[in-house]
From Swiss-Prot:
Record's compositionally biased regions (Pro residues): 27-36
Organism name: Macaca fascicularis (Crab-eating macaque)
Region (Disordered) residue spans: 1-73
Family classification: Belongs to the ADAD family.
Keywords attached to this entry: Cytoplasm, Differentiation, Nucleus, RNA-binding, Spermatogenesis
Gene3D superfamilies, per database record: 3.30.160.20
Protein name, per record: Adenosine deaminase domain-containing protein 2
GO molecular function terms listed in the Swiss-Prot or TrEMBL record: double-stranded RNA adenosine deaminase activity; double-stranded RNA binding; tRNA-specific adenosine deaminase activity
Pfam families for this protein: A_deamin, dsrm
SMART domains in UniProt: ADEAMc
PROSITE patterns assigned: A_DEAMIN_EDITASE, DS_RBD
Keyword RNA-binding: yes
Gene encoding the protein: ADAD2
Length: 580
């Protein structure tokens, strides 16, 4: 989806422009896109095959070999799925105003029209311009038009410039209201209708992200699917590109690149083949799906020719560091349906003046072990060494704010990737507590010098409350033990049985997930060959393939957490000793 905005400097991380006005609705309702048959819902809609559950029929991804999970696939499939990504990057035309904002049912007094329109445009981040017609009509000497993000509304005419501007503002407000109430123009109009206001100029940043996550899920699964209720825990990663437009404006193109659902972890014994998914919470799964997408982007940039280099979100960079980085004017956003478990959820903590808040018990690291969430200091070492244990989503968000989303394998190839914003659809969360859980653990005191090796640095997320997309009905028990994942380039949803950490199957033990460690190690070696880094191919085990600087930053982070009484980040080197 695209809208005009004021540009940001290349490579800068700025607050999403359209999110400035986002507010929590007093009575939040699940946001639903228009049905596919509605005008503009999908432009164009992909071919659908109802025999295949209504999933889009495009080039099928060919995974490389059985056994240790699916590979990242062939380059052609990734390029073909770019088309689907563009479809998911368009917003359904939804006749709803942003949460917390509304226009009066009747036209305001002319004297108030300009200020009302200015306030409305500023709250959404829309560029508002008033343009005077140099050739007014014969009846009135002044003609002024209001332009909203490049869309010119019907002109206002009067005997003075002030009155013409007021009439132009009234005309723009009336036009916006008509678009909200009826997005389709009457076909019996006596004159050609003006170009419609883009819904991208009306929806906020959070609503746009929610629209993509909801519509992407609906495209992959319909309401008849037994997995439909998994939408209640959906999380997604949205990629935003800024593209220069006309008159110095910048268009923002949003694209859904990863989805995940789930609300629990595998609670069984550890296994050491790398074929078991441990943490199946929606946010964690969406982030792992993002990694799969990034491996594909590396192949696209290295093996896709000139077109692949243009389409990839990664670009080569000179110097001694990783050979690739995120392109300028490209941003990542996280959308989650539920408040992250752990420190962000357990208790409301008012600020304290002594700086002791990060050390309080609720802010300690917490781990899921044997189906229970408890502080890591209370987990017996024997359990950590033998059973699956996963730190809470709150703790992982705090970690990603420092180390980035890329992980230890991609750190060889891509500079740290940080999310620009987090949209949380749970209206019951406490924003200050969420912010402290992510941005204050551990305390990084610059007075003592740099605590982390470069290029790692804490990067704050812009936090927003967003509209929920979950079904209104309670999630059935059948979905509590399942986790779904998808990334841009995958032919469809993968269903994982949380109890086994493997793909759901009729047999007792299904095949490995395409998001498991073994699959990522295979993808790492595939990309290492593509980028011409033979020394990386010599790193045979998963543990050996982890980048040294990333591991050092992780060690420093764990040390600081432990020194500040928050608990040490658990380490399980034996789990990574496998080789493909």
């Amino acid at each position: 989806m695209a809208s005009a905005s004021q540009g940001a400097d290349d490579g800068s991380r700025r607050k999403p422009r359209l999110a400035a006005s986002l507010q929590i609705s007093p009575e939040p309702r699940p946001w639903r896109p228009l049905p596919p048959q509605a005008q503009g819902a999908w432009e164009p809609a992909p071919a659908m095959d109802h025999a295949e559950g209504g999933q889009p029929q495009v080039s099928v991804l060919r995974d490389s070999g059985p056994g240790a999970g699916a590979g990242v696939g062939e380059l052609g499939a990734a390029q073909a799925w770019e088309n689907l990504g563009e479809q998911m990057g368009r917003t359904p035309r939804v006749p709803v105003p942003p949460a917390g904002l509304s226009l009066p049912l009747k036209d305001p007094p002319a004297s108030q029209a300009v200020s009302l329109l200015t306030e409305y445009a500023a709250s959404l981040g829309i560029i508002l311009l008033f343009r005077e017609d140099q050739q007014p009509g014969p009846c009135f000497p002044f003609s002024v038009s209001a332009e909203l993000d490049g869309v010119v509304c019907p002109a206002g005419t009067a005997n003075s410039k002030t009155e013409a501007k007021q009439q132009a503002a009234l005309s723009a407000l009336c036009y916006i209201r008509s678009q909200l109430e009826s997005p389709e123009s009457p076909q019996t109009s006596s004159r050609p209708p003006p170009p419609p206001l883009s819904v991208d100029s009306i929806l906020t940043h959070g609503q746009r992200c929610a629209a993509l996550v909801s519509a992407g899920f609906d495209l992959l699964l319909d309401e008849r699917s037994p997995y439909w209720a998994c939408k209640g825990t959906v999380a997604g990663v949205i990629l935003e590109r800024e593209i220069p437009g006309a008159r110095g404006h910048v268009k923002e193109i949003y694209k859904l690149v990863a989805l995940g659902t789930g609300s629990s972890c595998c609670a069984g014994w550890l296994e050491f083949s790398g074929q078991q998914l441990h943490d199946c919470h929606g946010l964690v799964i969406a982030r792992r799906a993002l990694l799969r997408f990034l491996f594909r982007q590396l192949l696209l940039a290295t093996q896709g020719g000139a077109k692949g280099k243009e389409q990839s979100v990664l670009a080569p960079q000179p110097g001694p560091g990783p050979p690739f980085t995120l392109k300028p004017r490209v941003f990542l956003h996280l959308y989650i349906s539920n408040t992250p478990k752990g420190a962000a959820r357990d208790i409301y903590l008012p600020p304290t003046s002594e700086g002791g808040l990060p050390h309080s018990p609720p802010m300690r690291l917490q781990a899921h072990v044997l189906g229970q969430l408890k502080p890591v200091c209370y987990v017996a070492p024997s359990l950590c060494d033998t059973h699956v244990g996963c730190l809470s989503a709150s703790d992982k968000l705090a970690r990603w704010a420092v180390l980035g989303l890329g992980g230890a394998l991609l750190a060889h190839l891509v500079s740290p990737l940080y999310s620009t914003s987090l949209i949380l659809a749970d209206s019951c969360h406490d924003p200050p507590t969420l912010s402290r859980a992510i941005h204050t653990r551990p305390c990084l005191d610059s007075v003592l010098g740099p605590c982390l090796p470069p290029p790692y640095v804490r990067t704050a997320l812009h936090l927003f409350s967003g509209p929920p997309v979950a079904p209104s009905e309670p999630t059935p028990d059948t979905c509590h033990g399942l986790s779904l994942n998808w990334s841009l380039g995958d032919p469809g949803i993968e269903v994982v049985d949380v109890a086994t950490g493997r793909v759901k199957a009729n047999a007792a033990l299904g095949p490995p997930s395409r998001l498991c460690k073994a699959s990522f190690l295979r993808a790492f070696h595939q990309v290492a060959r593509a980028v011409g880094k033979p020394y990386l191919l010599a790193l045979k085990t998963y543990e050996a393939a982890k980048a040294g600087p990333y591991q050092e930053a992780r060690r420093q982070l764990s040390l600081l957490l432990d020194q500040q009484g928050l608990g040490a980040w658990p380490s399980k080197p034996l789990v990574g000793k496998f080789r493909n």
